[in-house]
UniProtKB/Swiss-Prot annotation:
<comment type="function">
    <text>Required for the first step of diphthamide biosynthesis, a post-translational modification of histidine which occurs in elongation factor 2. DPH1 and DPH2 transfer a 3-amino-3-carboxypropyl (ACP) group from S-adenosyl-L-methionine (SAM) to a histidine residue, the reaction is assisted by a reduction system comprising KTI11/DPH3 and a NADH-dependent reductase, predominantly CBR1. Acts as an electron donor to reduce the Fe-S cluster in DPH1-DPH2 keeping the [4Fe-4S] clusters in the active and reduced state.</text>
</comment>
<feature type="region of interest" description="Required for interaction with the elongator complex">
    <location>
        <begin position="66"/>
        <end position="82"/>
    </location>
</feature>
<keyword id="KW-0560">Oxidoreductase</keyword>
<comment type="pathway">
    <text>Protein modification; peptidyl-diphthamide biosynthesis.</text>
</comment>
<comment type="subunit">
    <text>Component of the 2-(3-amino-3-carboxypropyl)histidine synthase complex composed of DPH1, DPH2, KTI11/DPH3 and a NADH-dependent reductase, predominantly CBR1. Interacts with DPH1. Interacts with DPH2. Interacts with CBR1. Interacts with elongation factor 2. Interacts with ATS1/KTI13; the interaction is direct. Interacts with the 40S ribosomal protein RPS7A. Interacts with the 40S ribosomal protein RPS19A. Interacts with the elongator complex subunit IKI3/ELP1. Interacts with the elongator complex subunit ELP2. Interacts with the elongator complex subunit ELP3.</text>
</comment>
<dbReference type="GO" id="GO:0008270">
    <property type="term" value="F:zinc ion binding"/>
</dbReference>
<dbReference type="GO" id="GO:0005506">
    <property type="term" value="F:iron ion binding"/>
</dbReference>
<dbReference type="GO" id="GO:0034986">
    <property type="term" value="F:iron chaperone activity"/>
</dbReference>
<dbReference type="GO" id="GO:0005634">
    <property type="term" value="C:nucleus"/>
</dbReference>
<feature type="binding site">
    <location>
        <position position="50"/>
    </location>
    <ligand>
        <name>Fe cation</name>
    </ligand>
</feature>
<comment type="similarity">
    <text>Belongs to the DPH3 family.</text>
</comment>
<dbReference type="GO" id="GO:0008198">
    <property type="term" value="F:ferrous iron binding"/>
</dbReference>
<dbReference type="GO" id="GO:0017183">
    <property type="term" value="P:protein histidyl modification to diphthamide"/>
</dbReference>
<keyword id="KW-0539">Nucleus</keyword>
<keyword id="KW-0963">Cytoplasm</keyword>
<feature type="binding site">
    <location>
        <position position="25"/>
    </location>
    <ligand>
        <name>Fe cation</name>
    </ligand>
</feature>
<dbReference type="InterPro" id="IPR007872">
    <property type="entry name" value="DPH_MB_dom"/>
</dbReference>
Length: 82
């Protein structure tokens, strides 16, 4: 599977009300990926309007702050890397 680009999680916009990260797509829409999907290992954000996809660069430990911002708990405890 080929992706359009590789984007750091810090460069994406987090929408706490949807628990979703977005990033502008060249088609005018936005790439989307859900926080829980990322927690489960998904690293590809998809644009709902075209066929483009991007790789999202993050560490699982990075997600804790976004769960806190959304006011929810992660599906399981996030352990710091040893």
């Amino acid at each position: 599977m080929s992706t359009y680009d590789e984007i750091e999680i810090e460069d994406m916009t987090f929408e706490p009300e949807n628990q979703m990260f977005t990033y502008p797509c060249p088609c005018g829409d936005r790439f989307q990926i859900y926080l829980d999907d990322m927690f489960e290992g998904e690293k590809v954000a998809v644009c709902p309007s075209c066929s483009l996809m991007i790789d999202v660069v993050f560490d699982k430990e990075d997600l804790a702050e976004y769960y806190e911002e959304a006011g929810i708990h992660p599906p399981e405890p996030i352990a710091a890397a040893a």
